[in-house]
UniProtKB/Swiss-Prot annotation:
Keywords: ATP-binding, DNA damage, DNA repair, DNA-binding, Nucleotide-binding. The keyword Hydrolase does not apply. ATP binds at G614, P615, N616, M617, A618, G619, K620, S621. HAMAP family: MutS. This is DNA mismatch repair protein MutS.
Amino acid sequence: MNHDRKITPIMQQYMMLKNQYKECLLFYRLGDFYELFFDDAIETSKVLNIVLTKKGNVPMCGVPFHSSESYLNRLVKLGYKVAICEQLETPEEAKKRGYKALVKRDVVRIVTPGTILEDSLLEAKENNYLCCIVNVNDNYAIAWLELSTGLFHYNTTDLRKIDSDLLRINPKEVLISDKLVELDLIYSTLKKYKFSITQYSSSFFDTSRSYNTLCSVYGISTLKGLGDLKDEEIAVCGSLLEYVKATQKGNLPKLEFPKAYGDRDFMFIDAAALRNLELFNTQSGDLEGSLISSIDYTITACGGRLLKRCLSAPLACSYAINRRLDIVEFFVNNKVLYKNVRETLRGIADIERILTRVKVGRCSPKDLYALKLTLDKTCILVNLLSKFDTSVVSDFCTRLGRYDDLCKTLSNVLIPNNVSNVKDGGFIKPDYDVQLSEYIYIQNYSNNLIQELRDKYRNITNIQNLKILYNNILGYYVEVSANHLINDKDFIHRQTLANSIRYTTSELKALESKIISARDAAISLEVKIFGQLCTRIIEHADEITMTAHAVSEIDMLTSFAELAIQYSYTRPVVDDSYEFNIQKGRHPVVERNGKFVANDIDLAQMQRVHLITGPNMAGKSTFLRQNALIGILAHIGSFVPAYSAHIGVIDKIFSRVGASDNIAFGYSTFMVEMTETAAIINQATDKSFVILDEIGRGTGTYDGLSIAWSVIEQIHNVNKSRAIFATHYHELSKLDECLENIKCFCMKVEEWNGKVVFLHEIIPGSTNKSYGIHVAKLAGFPQSVLDRAEDLMNKLKANEDLLT
């Protein structure tokens, strides 16, 4: 910013603010635009593809205030932080301090990827988490908060689990110290998944400061009421709040107290399993083809977010799982109710996020009207559910609540509207307030009032061509032709033109003042009434939050009922046993593509490890994944795609399926495979579920076979997990002779007339045939290459020299 010309007062003000927010793009409010100057302007014009201009030698660009959210959205999604500088007074108010006084401006908030509140910038069915990681005395903790809903959780962790934690939480922004980000394990994870990173020095994460921040934000004198918090937990929660305070300039919504995320309450899904099982995205990053795309029948935004949270952290408590299953079964068995409930849900807005915007004063009139309609719908839900005298749904009736008085008030005050900006007005019923009614009458009937006054003056002066006109210089004025002089003391001469004479009157000036000021006065009054409505809603904030949670659950669980009815899912038996018995199980995603061959599996304690051999393309990987997915679906409280299912609670799911090169970070496919397998054998328990596909394939035959053999022995003898292994090493089938709880299966294949048919069916036994040349033929290899491969394979089988 080296510019030689004299700096204007406006630029002095801008530069003073910019120096305070150097890491941000500064949106500086000038009238109806947000302006950017100097380097900010050059960068923003390039990124947003908007015109870059110059005033003197100062580069500048701008975006209209009324459409700024779309520009903000693009910048924030690209990882930029934007400081919003607003005018804190009108030019008229500034002039009262002196004719040349500069309008006061200041930054009112900083918009970052993890602190967004605007509905248009948020994905409806995605949580927008801000996350923080700290290390205090070599003890790690992680916390995540969603400003738009108030959700706030924390947990202790360790370096091995941070990648799984981050994938499960999927934050939009990660707050971290300079020292931590230098650690290879953390740095590689942050870069690999392209999380937006905000770095501070280690002093920002000080435990004592964090303690004081927590007490200050929640208005308490001690943290004892939050439980026995460790130093690292205090540091991570307090640092997160300190950052939010800084970005919101102290204007915080009411947040939930931070809740400990109990590892024992939820199934742990490691990072590899989250990727390999394609819970939220396919390996190529697409939503289509993922599990969530196949099971998400939620209608509301908050229901969709709850489903994602549940899928990333399934329950690990049989009682809680069966409570959900009871509700799903209730709706499956009461189809008329289920359909009525689903239809009612279609009119429900995003209660959680609307309520947060109300709390921080950033809601719109259309938000309040949407909330009014939503609370009406929740009353309908209560009426529907209360007809059934059963404990399964009675809890919902209590939590949904009733808002008759609040809804009546909102109905009496609000006009059905889609007004985004409270300062636009036009959303309060005129008859709600006498003064407002008068202002709006003046606005709506100003032409009539002017015409009435014109007719009155025509009668007084007896000049029938008398007109009342308006321009920006004179305002309203009376005009008569030049040959008509008005000799009435009430008519004050203003202007004589060649063909006309213009007058004004005190009565006309008073009416003009009323007309011009009526709109401003009406808007001011509407803003005041709007504020009163917001205060009334905030008084019910805790109950409305409870209602939002109940709506989310009803939506998610009725969506499970829809899934069960539409695709013939069945209720699983979930208990505290070690069972994993699935009859006629199906893959919840693959079966949507057409005919699917169902398969059985029984990982009883006496055969808790299954070893599957067979050719590629026969369906081994699909079978492995389908059983892991069935286990996950059962643990979120959903029915499952099977004829029957009996599943003992799973504490952790591990998956080593499919290639996932990390060459960009210096890791080969084989190294990634070994690292993920090491994580499994170091963490799996006898309550875990493990699927492993083609362990050892990335190295020499003897190395690979030896590693695969020893891994199976370890999981069988030490971890004692329920596990399914798929392998092309047919030698591993000998393990059933020395390990008592292993059983061999293979993929059924039929051959006739030189043709091979993969039946995708699991049968007992093993096979040493890989059918690789047949797969190559299906892939389109030239016949000459296939013939040569056949010839070489025959030589290998006969132990002949390949060079002869």
